[in-house]
């Protein structure tokens, strides 16, 4: 028996020896290959580390667009199934902390037992995952959490817009892939975009498995020239106009488009740019924003049907997606740069400047208004024709009264060649190259030497027959009143890195001088007559206590069939302030206002400008130079009451616009409903740390709160000269803050209705 055991032991020993020899031989011949294979099997797949898209801020640092870290909830079913003891505790954790349907998880796990990437919930905020994170880190719950396996989070970024609809036309938004579309998001997409990082493993020269990480490079931040407070003021009054005029003479919005630009006349910086209707940047695909607009069919043609709640609701159905997209594309466009129209009588100061600069006019000439003038077989009326001929008018009086006949005579003195030369000098027919996506081309929409004859020259003198964009008009107008200096309009003042260091300062770019300082001075005088003259068409644009200049405009529109509309107009006011030392220009346009009396609507364009300037000028520390009339003082007192009511209703003192400038943040939790609005901006398979890695959204450095001299830190209305709190018994103060009444001086002549050719 003992011998048998010895023999068996020897045989086993020989077998082990033989196996060892075999292993040595295999290792000698194929060891490197097998070792690399084993090491390669040990390394993890390459992981992408997402970059953070740069922020868009206003000129004072208010966040207009930012990116927040979000988390996708992922379940590794294979890991959960490693032990039977893991399954139910893991599913229970999903139910308790994330409200996941446990039965749904069980069913999926049964069908896909080897799945390692089951996405249960997308784009959760850190707050939504923090309770689970704390539970897993809590050692006192070890008896429970040690059985929770396979739950992990994939990081990405979501684009958020803290002020929702504020400056939506200017900002634009991002698609689901993180690329910008429309506005600054599109134009500066390459600047705002960063470079994804990577975490990966490799085998080094010593056959060791190494891990390395290439950090993500975040995008640059873009500082806009937009002032959020001024932007909010502009948007408030555009909305107020719509609210007061929608459904007035026909169903629909107060105007097809209502828009405004405020620009620094000495730099081309855009301080505010807005149009109505607007949309929520956090919910760009919401069809409710279309209510009140005319329906655009699936072929892209405008119809007479007005979108109501029922039509908007039907657009949410999948079969109507093409219809929704057509109408949203129209909504997302920026009227101030994307749309063209005939400028009407706001063109008249440009024409006067042509003749003065060319030397064919001295400034002391008079021209006769005969009420009607015949050009090329067409009879063209003066807008005031119903009251008879205006008689002999100076150039200034022609601008003040907005007389078409005398402007035609001035254009005839200038001549076709010089007229076309200055049209190009003012940049009509050329893009301004503003740094926003989608500026319209107008080269084919203006006359040239082959297409302009006597009739075209005549109609061009009062702004009909050719098309412009709002940005062309206000940029050219700034050169008329700032001494002749034409600055390229721009929306961004600087670009910074994620650490705050300045990458690039964008300085004003002077392109040319359109007219001399002497001509510019005369044009300013003429524009002041429009507002202050006895027969001025722009008297309702005058803010209390200030002198300003400007020009009203009314132009007939052209229907889809090419005929002149007799009831639909474009009315506008183009002005500057203050008259003594121009600092800002303002341009208000109402496209096809919801009214029949176009003179009245020109007044309303003036009133919008007046209300905006009443708030903006004191905000910019531009003080009154005129004593208030009793009527003006009454208006300002009514405004003070309105502000007190807003304050008593707990309205944020800094929210002068009625928009979300006050720092109200959007709800960033959960899966957003914005469709293409927010972007995943790439993702990273990473388990977040216990601390909140980023808190980027929601804080808005309110320019109004920091700079408004009329509200103290407690939100109380104060006298800016004494600092005393104004009560119901106070006498008030002279400088307006917000929202004066719209009743201007009685007896205003209103706007100038553009005349059709008979």
Predicted feature residues:
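Beta-lactam-recognizing serine transpeptidase/beta-lactamase-like catalytic domain environment
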Residues: 65, 71, 203-215, 258, ...
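Short helix-loop capping/hinge segments that flank enzyme active sites or metal/cofactor-binding pockets
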Residues: 686, 703-704
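Short coil/loop linkers at secondary-structure junctions
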Residues: 99-101, 361-362, 429, 623, ...
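Periplasmic/cell-envelope proteins involved in peptidoglycan metabolism and beta-lactam response
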Residues: 1-311, 340, 417-425, 543, ...
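Short, highly charged C-terminal tails/helix-capping segments
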Residues: 624-648
């Amino acid at each position: 028996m003992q011998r048998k055991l010895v023999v068996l032991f020897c045989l086993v020993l020989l077998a082990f020896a033989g196996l060892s020899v075999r292993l040595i031989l295999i290792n000698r011949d194929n060891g490197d290959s097998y070792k690399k294979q084993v090491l390669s099997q040990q390394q993890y797949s390459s992981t992408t580390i997402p970059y953070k898209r740069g922020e868009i801020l206003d000129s004072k640092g208010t966040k207009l667009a930012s990116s927040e870290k979000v988390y996708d909830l992922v379940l590794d079913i294979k890991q959960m199934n490693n032990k039977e003891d893991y399954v139910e505790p893991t599913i229970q954790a999903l139910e308790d902390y994330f409200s996941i349907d446990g039965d749904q998880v069980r069913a999926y796990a049964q069908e896909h037992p080897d799945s390692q990437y089951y996405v249960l919930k997308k784009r959760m905020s850190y707050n939504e995952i923090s309770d689970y994170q704390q539970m897993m880190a809590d050692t006192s719950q070890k008896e429970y959490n040690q059985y929770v396996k396979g739950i992990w989070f994939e990081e990405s970024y979501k684009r958020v817009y803290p002020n929702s609809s504020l400056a939506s036309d200017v900002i634009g938004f991002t698609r689901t892939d993180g690329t910008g579309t429309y506005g600054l998001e599109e134009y500066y997409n390459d600047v705002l975009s960063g470079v994804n990082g990577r975490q990966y493993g490799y085998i080094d020269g010593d056959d060791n498995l190494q891990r390395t990480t290439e950090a993500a490079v975040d995008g640059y931040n873009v500082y806009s020239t937009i002032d959020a407070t001024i932007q909010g003021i502009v948007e408030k009054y555009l909305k107020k106009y719509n609210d007061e005029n929608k459904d007035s003479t026909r169903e629909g919005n107060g105007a097809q488009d209502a828009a405004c630009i405020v620009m620094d006349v000495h730099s081309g910086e855009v301080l505010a740019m807005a149009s109505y209707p607007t949309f929520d940047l956090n919910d760009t695909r919401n069809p409710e924003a279309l209510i009140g607009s005319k329906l655009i069919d699936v072929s892209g043609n405008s119809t007479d049907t007005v979108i109501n709640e029922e039509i908007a609701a039907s657009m949410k159905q999948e079969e109507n997606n093409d219809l929704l997209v057509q109408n949203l594309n129209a909504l997302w466009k920026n009227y101030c740069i994307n749309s063209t129209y005939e400028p009407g009588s706001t063109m008249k100061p440009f024409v006067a400047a042509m003749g003065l600069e060319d030397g064919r006019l001295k400034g002391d000439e008079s021209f006769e208004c005969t009420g009607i003038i015949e050009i090329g077989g067409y009879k063209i009326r003066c807008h005031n024709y119903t009251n008879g001929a205006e008689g002999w008018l100076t150039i200034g009086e022609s601008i003040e009264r907005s007389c078409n006949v005398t402007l035609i005579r001035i254009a005839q003195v200038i001549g076709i060649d010089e007229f076309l030369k200055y049209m190009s000098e003012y940049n009509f027919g050329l893009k301004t190259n503003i740094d926003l996506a989608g500026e319209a081309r107008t080269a084919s929409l203006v006359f040239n030497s082959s297409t302009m004859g006597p009739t075209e020259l005549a109609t061009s003198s009062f702004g009909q027959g050719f098309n412009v964009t709002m940005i062309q008009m206000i940029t050219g107008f700034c050169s008329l009143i700032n001494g002749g200096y034409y600055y390229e309009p721009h929306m961004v003042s600087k670009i910074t890195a994620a650490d705050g260091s300045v990458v690039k300062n964008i300085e004003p770019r002077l392109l040319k001088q359109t007219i001399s300082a002497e001509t510019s001075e005369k044009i300013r005088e003429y524009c002041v007559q429009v507002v202050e003259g006895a027969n001025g068409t722009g008297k309702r644009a005058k803010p209390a206590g200030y002198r300003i200049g400007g020009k009203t405009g009314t132009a007939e529109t052209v229907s889809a069939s090419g005929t002149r509309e007799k009831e639909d107009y474009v009315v506008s006011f183009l002005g500057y302030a203050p008259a003594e030392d121009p600092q800002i220009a303002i341009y208000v346009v109402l496209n096809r206002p919801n009214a029949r009396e176009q003179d009245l609507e020109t007044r309303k364009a003036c009133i919008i400008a007046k209300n905006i300037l009443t708030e903006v000028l004191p905000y910019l520390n531009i003080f009154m130079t005129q004593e208030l009339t009793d009527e003006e003082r009454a208006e300002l007192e009514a405004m003070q009451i309105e502000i007190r009511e807003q304050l008593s209703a707990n309205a944020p003192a800094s929210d002068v616009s009625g928009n979300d400038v006050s720092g109200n943040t959007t709800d960033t939790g959960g899966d957003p409903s914005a469709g293409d609005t927010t972007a995943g901006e790439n993702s990273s398979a990473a388990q977040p740390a216990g601390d909140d890695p980023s808190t980027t959204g929601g804080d808005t450095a309110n320019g109004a709160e920091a700079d408004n001299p009329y509200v103290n830190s407690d939100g109380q209305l104060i006298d800016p000269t004494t600092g005393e709190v104004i009560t119901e018994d106070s006498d008030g103060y002279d400088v307006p803050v917000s929202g004066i009444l719209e009743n201007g001086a009685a007896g205003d002549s209103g706007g100038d209705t553009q005349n059709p050719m008979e």
